[in-house]
From Swiss-Prot:
Protein name: Ribonuclease M5
Purpose: Required for correct processing of both the 5' and 3' ends of 5S rRNA precursor. Cleaves both sides of a double-stranded region yielding mature 5S rRNA in one step.
Keyword Transport: no
EC number: 3.1.26.8
Transmembrane portions of the chain: none
Species this chain originates from: Enterococcus faecalis (strain ATCC 700802 / V583)
Assigned protein family: Belongs to the ribonuclease M5 family.
Location of this chain's protein in the cell: Cytoplasm
Amino acid sequence: MKVAEIIVVEGKDDTRRIQEVVAADTIETIGSAINDEILTQIEHAQETRGVIIFTDPDYSGEKIRKTIMEVVPDAKHAFLSRKVAVPKKNGGSLGVEHASDEAIIEALKKVVTPVQADEDYQEIPRQTLVEYGLIAGANAKKYRELLGDDLRIGYTNSKQLVKRLSMFRITEAELKESMTRILKELANEE
């Protein structure tokens, strides 16, 4: 599989892993404190070929994603679930470099692009998120993680959830479908 866009990753291990799986060029952020030179490089890459932000499914990865989005709001996003980014050995951190070939290819095939302001879009009411147990409640974190995987929008904490759903223009109907699938799967596991 050849990827036309330039993939933005966190480090050289991610680059190595991506290039083992697909033919792609990468830009490495070299950690979460991205310098202006790298941001300029990412901005230029977006103008010429487009970029896909493919960071680790952890706090640092989200911080990097947010920083890049301030400069390149129309960048595409590839997300890995936390469960497929777990290191083989105990003690390591979550990372793109630990994902299987299949997980990387799947994430790149399901790239999502945030949409700019749309006057017709109805933001999902916070109360709806509370009713689904996504904000507050014993299973809120687990539900948000499963929702992020199902909708391919990545994991968010409760404060980020409304913004992320809005950014990708997830409708209340799509949320309901996703939560119905998630709750059905969880019921089948019991």
